[in-house]
């Protein structure tokens, strides 16, 4: 009997020890992930936060009950470099689009100045690193839609001088010189003028963003650009077969020329199940969206809130499936398996998309680092994905821009 008691005690002790080792190991990974995340430059290439600034009631410096981005949540999530999107609807063209874009740029710059204790305007990789060393959040700007140059190539120089560092060639609609992925083809990709736009962007140190564009526009831009392309907020078509996403061939040729695709967190682009279900209710959604536009007018934040409420109602009613934040990891992993860890990063579409369950805002970003670490990614590769890859492309762009300007 005594032997049995001793034996049971030994087993209990061994199991307790084993359990302790496992817990310690799990805690060690969590601790390593947190240390890695908060010591890295975490650079997201697309947030529509300026639309919230336009309301005049949103204070970037205070934690907000709505939306995805504000300074307190950026601090909590270790998000220390963010591209703010300058967005005007593609139905506004010419001088009005230019003026509205300039107003948004000015608004972003004002907010950075207003919150100078926490924020710093950045236009290149060196300035991002400097802000990080100072404990500040680097704010950058990208223009979402080539219609905002108003068919005037000189506006690229103006926007670049004001600190804009990328431009998406088209948005949901075709513009005057580039086809969109979600509109009927009008130009067979890029027009001659569109190709000149890409060359001028190279010259002015403005990254060429191929999110939203048609496949033909993408291949045209790839052929013309001397600087690696970026997809500021796109996901993998092999996982969710949406035209906004990139095919495996597109990812391969993008990577072959040094480019980077930044994964979008929008449910429609993350999950094929969700995309298919959404397509089945698209007619109802379109009718409701028209209703929202009538009620909200030009207030994109109002429209966005109404759309998110509608999607939550449809999910609650079982018409749309839930989408886990872990789909983001699936998309990242697909790109890494396809072309390696040097060509993928984070392009959330915060404040402009419906986030997946478990990653409701930017405060949840450390989950991504921990998940990648648990999958066996090296710390070096995780740092690349968090921001290092896009910093590399920015440095290449700056170098090529100087060479092109010197050759003029």
Each language-model region and where it sits:
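Distinct, well-ordered alpha-helical segments
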Residues: 152-156, 217-227
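Short, contiguous, pocket-lining structural segments
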Residues: 186-193, 209-214, 246
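Substrate-binding cleft of carbohydrate-active enzyme catalytic domains
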Residues: 197-210, 214-217, 250-256
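N-terminal hydrophobic targeting/anchoring segments and the immediately downstream early-domain regions
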Residues: 17-188, 237, 241-408
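Bacterial N-terminal signal peptides
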Residues: 7-18
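Positively charged n-region of N-terminal signal peptides that target proteins for export
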Residues: 1-4
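Alpha-helix-loop-beta-strand connector modules within alpha/beta enzyme cores
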Residues: 187-202, 221-229
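His/Asp/Glu-rich metal/cofactor-coordinating catalytic motifs and the adjacent surface-exposed loops
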Residues: 223-233, 237-238, 244
